[in-house]
Amino acid sequence: MRPFTYERATSAEDALERHNGGAVYLGGGTNLVDLMRLGVEEPGRLVDVAHLPYGEVELRPDGSLVIGAAVSNSDLAADPTVREGHQVLAQAVLMGASGQIRNLATVGGNLLQRTRCSYFQDTAKPCNKRNPGSGCPAREGEHHNLAILGHSPACVATHPSDMAVALAALNASIRIRGRAGERTIPIEDLHRLPGDEPQRDTTLEDGDLITAVEVPALGMPSRYRKVRERASFAFALVSIAAALDVRDGLVHDVRLALGGVAHKPWRAWRAEEALRGAEATEEAFQRAAEAELEAAEPLRDNGYKVPLARNLIVRTLAELAGTGES
């Protein structure tokens, strides 16, 4: 591990001032410190922002939430306002990592965690995300757990966060403090597809600090489902965050986002469009899933993710509609 200095920020303004010359923000450190040990990340300075006053979950009168970026994953999942009004978010958080890691990991850090692609984590191997221009050996190598949607010749990595998938389905917004002041962006605009710059995971600018996540009221049943290679402490092969409002047998509103299939949480806009106003039947859910997955471009060894994602969409929607087994 490269030598580094450690500083604790006392405010957002102080954090911005300290973020220069190779500095990196430190929250819980559950991903960053691992990457430092591997030599993937080599910051010269860590600026600790975990103790800034962003550690609360606020329930607004309209049922929306403001979640501070320093809230731990454990506290978020246990918060009664989250468990009652945004079940999909609590479920997603509890399906990520282990209890010990959730105790340390923060909301802001969870959103910014980096891919678990084995080539990215091995500094002896080329990787366009870690070393731009060096190539993407995963395309012809080990990629059974990598992307089937939105990837590019430069990168087939997937985003690892369960929480981010749920927040995408919830139409969350990200509150950011930057050098030009504060701004709020849709979570859809936070993470990037790889394109020809896979080293850029997000649209954040130098020094930008996530301070909170705003989550609108939901008002319909929701669920998070995750398929993984073992029962716990494993990243998704495919996951889904779903919410469904059925009235008089018709889909009034629906939210769908997929994890484990793309470089970012994949909002299933095509499937949502196909479902609104349709009958809430498994046949309609099947057609919507197929419409979404028409864009899939599986590689040699991850084609199984297409039927897996399709079946997960259909099963989860059927559960929410009361037409399938839970």
Regions found by a protein language model. Give the residues of each.
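C-terminal structural segment of proteins
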Residues: 1-326
